Amino acid sequence: AGHKCGRMHGHGFEVILHADQDLVGRALGVDFDRIDALWAPIHAELDHACLNDLPGLANPTSETISAWIWARLKPQLPELSWVTVYETASCGAHFDGSHYRIWKEMTLDSAVRLARAPAGDPRRRIHGHTYTLRLHLHAALDQVMGWTIDFGDVKTLFAPIFTRLDHHPLHELPGVADNDTASLARWIRAQASPLLPVLDRIDLYETRGCGAILGWAEDGPALP
């Protein structure tokens, strides 16, 4: 009661459909035109619509939307393996027919120095990055709230760690092996796991496309 998400609001949702490819039994792995055709009527239902009025979407969280899409698409597209729903650019949910996963993304502006970089390498000097950090969590759906974990709760629980990272020199952190993204991701896991026990993957990028993925779940790093 009283949660802001209980008030009428809207999002620019985006959806990714993941499909397994049979590269042995077919000449064509995935027929994208077929996926477009199957998606078109679902898109027509969802686009510019009050989602709460659609049967099965009385509580349209990113988790319930991903399951709703799965239920309509899977019978027609057996290759469907995951449905991803972006609620905003920085958070969303995945559903594979059985399990829900969510992620929360944030940025960090931090100073770093790589002690183990080769002699003469400029990365041994103090420099900085605007890091992109994405936390992935795997939990059961709360049937009352319609989500696994409130994105706001993830942000609040992670806040003490975020405060230690953002606008700070990371080379001064106690217990961090070095300032490469893999070492930093391992440090973040050690600090965050007691606060977020359902955390099972950390993505940390120092620049776009350059970083580390640390995962300890069965699904591996295939999902975005």
Segment roles from a protein language model:
Residues A1-P224:
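Charge-rich, low-complexity N-terminal segments
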